[in-house]
Amino acid sequence: MTQFEKLDLLLRECGGTIQTFQVLNNGISKSVFYAYVKERGLEQASHGVYVSPDTWTDAMYLLHLRCGQAVFSHETALFFHDLTDREPLKYTITVRTGYNPSRLQEDGFQVYTVKKDLHEIGITTMLTSFGHSVPAYDMERTICDLLRSRKNIEMQVFQDALKQYAKRKDKNLRVLMKYAAMFHVEKILRPYLEVLL
């Protein structure tokens, strides 16, 4: 099997998206890989990420590959959890404080930052419409994030999401209140819950 055939197989196994580190881990040099990229007409989606020209582009998955610490949050997480019927105009992510989000913002993403110890709270895995796994915050964390960012969020979006959450059988009010205390939004959240529950 030639190295190009190995790369063809790897590209198929990875669903048409391949990263340079995967190539190197399979014992193929960068120079061979770059010749393959040119020969097969692969497009560079971001640094170290290449996509086959006949593959549908999964923007969410590419964003995840581009910025591994990014977690889909706010309106995008609402959409993942069916807590809104509005498809987000731009994807919203949260990264740790200290990460420079300027390039992501220039590319049209809404980026929030949070302290490192709060970044990992409530992370779950969701599937994009293309079937790729990406990190997103759970419903309870998303509601707390919306309250923390309420100056940047339409109040109607938050209220509709909370109404949808209250109807859900898989809601976890204990976790919601725990997160609300951690994120200092308990006093704001409680009156809404008293009306809905």
What residues fall within each predicted segment?
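Conserved short "hinge" loops at termini or chain/domain junctions
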Residues: 1, 19-21, 26
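Nucleic-acid-binding surface
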Residues: 6, 17-22, 49-197
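Short amphipathic alpha-helical interaction segments
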Residues: 26-38
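A short, conserved structural fragment
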Residues: 40-46
